[in-house]
A protein has these predicted regions:
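Intrinsic low-complexity, intrinsically disordered segments enriched in polar/basic residues
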Residues: 1-2, 53
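Intrinsically disordered, low-complexity terminal tails/loops enriched in metal-binding residues
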Residues: 14-131
Length: 131
């Protein structure tokens, strides 16, 4: 059987490109989840300024959060970000998807101790780890 070096080279290049794209995606996911985590922590603490700063760190994804004028607006923007955070978090170790049954909202956090970003300090422990 003759080896076709062009075919082998093409397969090798495609494999290398796939690995490179996966690494880039993973780095982007980590950056997103890090900034998202800062927003989560700020909202748990009812810190609008910290949430807005985290929104800026999120780039275009965090535009609504960075422009929020109230904690309610920030939490609404964070809810949209949470929808986006669930998928990359599933592929990263140390991230957990949590759910608040009273508000019917999900979020991603790094701790297994519930820290609900949606209900303010009065609802900080409302929720459960889903994944």
């Amino acid at each position: 059987m003759k080896l076709n070096y062009k075919t082998i080279l093409a397969v090798f290049a495609a494999t290398a490109l796939t690995v490179s794209l996966q690494a880039a995606s993973s780095d982007q996911d980590k950056q997103f989840l890090t900034a998202y985590g800062k927003a989560h922590d700020a909202l748990v603490a009812d810190d609008l300024g910290g949430a807005k700063k985290a929104g800026t760190d999120l780039g275009p994804d965090g535009a609504d959060l960075s422009k929020s004028k109230s904690l309610d607006e920030a939490r609404a923007a964070f809810d949209k970000l949470s929808d986006k955070a669930v998928k990359p978090a599933a592929g990263q170790s140390g991230y957990h998807v949590a759910h608040c049954p009273m508000l019917n909202k999900d979020w991603v956090q790094t701790s297994t101790t519930i820290a609900n970003p949606y209900g303010g300090k009065g609802m900080i422990s409302c929720g459960e780890i889903k994944k």
